[in-house]
From Swiss-Prot:
Pfam families: QueC (PF06508)
UniProt keyword terms in alphabetical order: ATP-binding, Ligase, Metal-binding, Nucleotide-binding, Queuosine biosynthesis, Zinc
The record's free-text note on cofactor binding: Binds 1 zinc ion per subunit.
Pathway: Purine metabolism; 7-cyano-7-deazaguanine biosynthesis
Gene giving rise to this polypeptide: queC
Full protein name: 7-cyano-7-deazaguanine synthase
Binding site for ATP: 18-28
Binding site for Zn(2+): 206, 221, 224, 227
Highest taxon, organism lineage: Bacteria
Listed EC numbers: 6.3.4.20
Length: 243
């Protein structure tokens, strides 16, 4: 990792949790619109939809092409291997099993501790890089009920990270109180229809990692919970645009 990037970012710089999905791509555009220096971080934890990691480079390149200022602000990309997370998780995201709901109402796509681990490692990297702001795509408005996506969870973790690292990190969750339709609209607000098309074409959301089927909202199996949320959100976004 080049150390000079940390100096360029300073405390005004940001680190974005960037999976290659719709939400993280929108969050990256949001961060590029606000911070003078932005770095990205992806995680390989043995997820079935590992194809999302392959989309990250194309999304980063596409975002820099949309706005010269974004290109100047976009810094290095980092990837961390968290194989242990996948090894201890018996979920439909890390095992070849059918997606279903458990008795507690949570889908078996929930990876316990995933966002807690992601944000903790992100803070450790931000500490080294000299970056104060950490941006994630967590949301509790239009989501699958994951407890580590809740606003209370993120606020509590921010306190713990700052106490444990003696820093003043700020955890930003720009999608926390908006639904998928509004997330599509936010992308248009940030980068126009060109950004919406970039997210449609290059981002990946499908839990099964399906890239063979192209829909108006992007690629995916079309039936898993992630595809369902994305498709319905895109439909509502288009309907609102037409009004």
């Amino acid at each position: 990792m080049p150390e000079d990037a940390a100096v360029a970012g300073g405390e005004a710089g940001a680190l974005v949790l960037f999976s290659g999905g719709q939400d993280s791509a929108t969050c990256l555009a949001w961060a590029l619109d606000r911070f003078p220096h932005v770095e990205t971080l992806g995680f390989d934890y043995g997820q079935r939809h590992w194809v999302e990691l392959d989309r990250r480079a194309a999304l980063r390149q596409g975002l820099t092409a949309l706005d010269p200022a974004w290109g100047r602000r976009l810094g290095p990309d980092h990837t961390l291997a968290l194989a242990a997370l996948g090894e201890i998780s018996d979920t439909a995201l890390t095992r070849d099993s059918a997606i279903a709901f458990a008795r507690d109402g949570l889908p078996n796509t929930f990876v316990p501790g995933r966002n807690l681990a992601f944000l903790t490692f992100a803070a450790a990297l931000a500490y080294r890089r000299g970056l104060r702001h950490i941006v994630g795509g967590m949301c509790e408005t239009d989501y699958s009920g994951y407890p580590d996506c809740r606003d209370d969870t993120i606020k509590a973790l921010q306190v713990a990270l700052n106490l444990g690292m003696e820093r003043r990190f700020v955890l930003h969750t720009p999608l926390m109180w908006i639904d998928k339709a509004q997330t599509w609209a936010l992308a248009e607000t940030l980068g126009g229809r060109a950004l919406v098309e970039l997210v449609v074409e290059e981002s990946h959301t499908c839990y099964l990692g399906e890239r063979g089927a192209r829909h108006e909202w992007g690629y995916g199996c079309g039936t898993c919970p992630a595809c369902d949320l994305r498709a319905k959100g895109f439909s509502r976004y288009l309907a609102a645009r037409a009004d």
